[in-house]
C-alpha cells in the first residue's frame, strides 16, 4: 500500500509567545515540532506499512527549515519525504495550502492519504478535507483507528 502522510511543522506550544501589539505568534526563537495530530498520522501509516507492506511518503509545505520535521519522520520509519517550499507560499490560507499540496499529490501514486485532524497553530481542521476536494476523492475526518482488510479500509471515528 502506498501511503502519503501530510505534515506541518508548527511552533512548540510550550514555548509560544505573543506579540502584545499585534496579538500574533512570535515565531523567532521558538522551536518547531511536527504537529501532534500529523505525528499520530505518521504512526498510523507506519503501523499499516508494518501490517500489510508498502511505503510511507511524507509531504509538507513550508519554509526550508521544515526539513527538520521531514527528517524526524524519516527517522520514525517513513520511506520518502517531500518538502514543497517557496517564498510565495508564505502566509498561505488553508485553501491555497490545500491546493498546493493537492497539486503535488497529483504527481504521486497513492492508495491512502492521511492528514492530521488540525494544526495546533491554526485549529481550522480544513486542509485535509480541502485536499480531498481538490483531488475529487472521498475523505473521512476524525478517524481514531484504521484497519486494512484486503482492499478495504475499516475506520473508527
Segments from the language model and where they lie:
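N-terminal glycine-rich FAD/FM-binding segment characteristic of electron-transfer flavoproteins
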Residues: 1-157
Amino acid at each position: 500500500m502506498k501511503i502519503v502522510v501530510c505534515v506541518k511543522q508548527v511552533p512548540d506550544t510550550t514555548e509560544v509567545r505573543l506579540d502584545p501589539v499585534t496579538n500574533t505568534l512570535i515565531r523567532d526563537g521558538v522551536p518547531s515540532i511536527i504537529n501532534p495530530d500529523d505525528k499520530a498520522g505518521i504512526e498510523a501509516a507506519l503501523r499499516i506499512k508494518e501490517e500489510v507492506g508498502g511505503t510511507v511518503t511524507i509531504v509538507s509545505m513550508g519554509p526550508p527549515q521544515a526539513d527538520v520535521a521531514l527528517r524526524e519522520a524519516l527517522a520514525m520509519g517513513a520511506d520518502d519525504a517531500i518538502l514543497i517550499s517557496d517564498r510565495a507560499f508564505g502566509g498561505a490560507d488553508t485553501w491555497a495550502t490545500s491546493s498546493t499540496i493537492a497539486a503535488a499529490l497529483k504527481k504521486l501514486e497513492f492508495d491512502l492519504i492521511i492528514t492530521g485532524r488540525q494544526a495546533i497553530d491554526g485549529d481550522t481542521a480544513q486542509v485535509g478535507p480541502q485536499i480531498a476536494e481538490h483531488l475529487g476523492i472521498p475523505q473521512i475526518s476524525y478517524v481514531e483507528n484504521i484497519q486494512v482488510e484486503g482492499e478495504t479500509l475499516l475506520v473508527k471515528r
